[in-house]
């Protein structure tokens, strides 16, 4: 027990760092949501990972940036004739978004190098966090890849690329937060016994939450939250009539606004049902209640966002809380792994 406590104290700085990295990712998700809802994401038309750290410093610099923006479809279709002050406002929102992304990278990379060289983290953890670093580099490219889709013909980004951008953020968050939970949750000498299927059940819920977050990105990218602003019915219907008007039929799942919103609603209710069942079956395990509370709050935020036609503050909270819900599920899974025991599951009985 003393050895375990000593290890825990030594790992505390690493745990704090991983927690900070997780919070930074959630902060980025919130800022990204604000940038999108403020329609500021296409105001910076170039990707300069190094030299783009500084904003325009002179009137001439600002004029050059505005001229570049005036060549974009968004300016011509939506913001034609905006003043320099209006342009600066949207430009600075996107600039802060990119600046915080760079800061997040530094918050991760510099301590990662230090802890690795000082051997404060095991080789296994180094490999996992190096994977997170690779995903971070990919995420930076994906962000520009998304923005680029709105600079060509249409004045909005591809909802597929938006979903990719959000999914990569979720993967990075998962790598940081699960490792943080692994440091924080101490193994118990006497472990609580659970059903052999519980961990698999939680894994299924995690996959469904991930799919739900992807469809949330589709809803955002297609502006699907601006239709059927009623709940629980969709303008008086359980199943709206226009779910399958696109051809081929499968395309409706990804590009029909009504279908995408319907799937997003259905997945929310499915996840809620599964979490309630999980809670009932594991009522003696306290972390499951965090998971249940998270899914209830997330659904309430989603319904309010829909009914009030996407108010910015509530919509951002809904996006951010999707990561908190995912994190609470990861926490419960890590808790099960470290503080419970279960019999070996036999899926194919002899």
From Swiss-Prot:
Localization terms from the record: Cell membrane
GO molecular function annotation: metal ion binding; oxidoreductase activity, acting on NAD(P)H, heme protein as acceptor
EC number(s) on file: 1.17.99.9
Top-level taxon in the UniProt lineage: Bacteria
Main location: membrane
Alphabetized InterPro entries for the sequence: COX15/CtaA_fam, HemeA_Synthase_type2
Keywords, comma-separated and alphabetical: Cell membrane, Heme biosynthesis, Iron, Membrane, Metal-binding, Oxidoreductase, Transmembrane, Transmembrane helix
Pfam families to which the protein is assigned, alphabetical: COX15-CtaA
Transmembrane region(s): 14-34, 95-115, 125-145, 162-182, 202-222, 260-280, 296-316, 317-337
Cofactor(s) named in the record: heme b
Pathway given in the UniProt record: Porphyrin-containing compound metabolism; heme A biosynthesis; heme A from heme O: step 1/1
Membrane disposition: Multi-pass membrane protein
GO biological process: one example: heme A biosynthetic process
Record field: catalytic activity: Fe(II)-heme o + 2 A + H2O = Fe(II)-heme a + 2 AH2
Positions bound to heme: 264, 318
One GO cellular component term noted in the UniProt record for this chain: plasma membrane
Family affiliation: Belongs to the COX15/CtaA family. Type 2 subfamily.
Assembly and binders: Interacts with CtaB.
Primary role: Catalyzes the conversion of heme O to heme A by two successive hydroxylations of the methyl group at C8. The first hydroxylation forms heme I, the second hydroxylation results in an unstable dihydroxymethyl group, which spontaneously dehydrates, resulting in the formyl group of heme A.
Protein name as it appears in the record: Heme A synthase
GN (gene name): ctaA
